[in-house]
Amino acid sequence: FTFSGHMVGAFISLVKCPDGDGLVFSGDVSGHNQETTQGVKTLSESFLEMAKFRECRRIILITEATNGNRDQEEGREKMDARLKAVLCETERKGGNALLPVFMVNRGPNIVAKLVRLGFKVFVAGGVRKTLAIEVGQKLLDKWLADGTVMLIKNGDDYEQQIRNAAHGQYGFRPIVTSSATLDQGAGVDFAIEMLPVQENVLISTGHRFDGSAMKEFFEIKNKPLGPGHTIVLNRMDRNFRSVKHAVNVRCSGHHFDYTAHSYRKELVTLATGLNPDVVFVKHCTEDGFKGLESALRSELGEKCPPISWARHLNLFEL
């Protein structure tokens, strides 16, 4: 096993089979650095040598292609500067920022990024559980002690804390909470309070799934407001029943591509460095598969190995 760069604890598995084949399961992989992890561009030859992996009869790579159809469009430093500018302008206008995130990986990464950029942060939802694991308990304790980070507390005043944070009663503190889809989690409670306020901003930092409330927000936010220009959010009541809330969207919205998955060029670098005899591609759309397949064929030409899309329940002959 070796680290994959995707998130704390993610790993690439190398398996030597009795028939002499060597299997490499990349899992989710990231070739670029994040706030809490260092990217992994290639597998080191010294690591492969430890298990005599180059001596395998064949090397079979099973990898992902979440971003197989696209390369990085905006550098991280430029993106960070744009994020800081958006937040500073929001504070100047008297608004607040809501950043719905995936609780694992993205949440701790975004909290760490906001702190590095000089902001105090309010954290809610499942991110409270993953933050200490991914940034470290010692650092989190420091942030809590000096007031850099506030965690929402369970209790009778839970809903009041949501309203206070949403309306700036704790000062300007961007709110980081799950879930990134806006279909569930504490993010829905904050969105109900914040989306109707023109001075606020909703910030997306990850993939926007088709059919999700987050995707719908970015499809309507620039349209004239009026009847029908709302999104319906599903909020859990005290009895854990889903209740629909129609929310009129008046705040602005911005997307930042802080993906934790390798881009196309990074996937090509990983594959070509390994020099596999067979490649299977999973965890992707058809566009993602075709994008990576085309890039590998362009890079390797006649030396390109067979490449197959590893769709669910499809059989392949090795």
Language-model-detected regions and their locations in the chain:
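Redox- and metal-dependent alpha/beta enzyme cores, enriched for Fe-S-associated oxidoreductases
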Residues: 195-251
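A short, acidic, amphipathic alpha-helical segment used as a generic capping/interface helix at domain edges
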Residues: 185-194, 259-273
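Proline-aspartate-enriched helix->loop->beta-strand connector
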Residues: 271, 275-281
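His/Asp/Glu-rich metal-coordinating catalytic cores
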Residues: 1-116, 120-124, 138, 143-146
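Short, well-ordered alpha-helical microsegments
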Residues: 10, 33, 107-110, 183-185, ...
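Short acidic, glycine/proline-enriched helix-loop-strand junctions
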Residues: 279, 288-316
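Hard-cation-handling environments
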Residues: 81-213, 221, 282
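Active-site neighborhood of phospho(di)ester-bond hydrolases with catalytic His/Asp-centered motifs
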Residues: 3-4, 24-29, 62-66, 98-102, ...
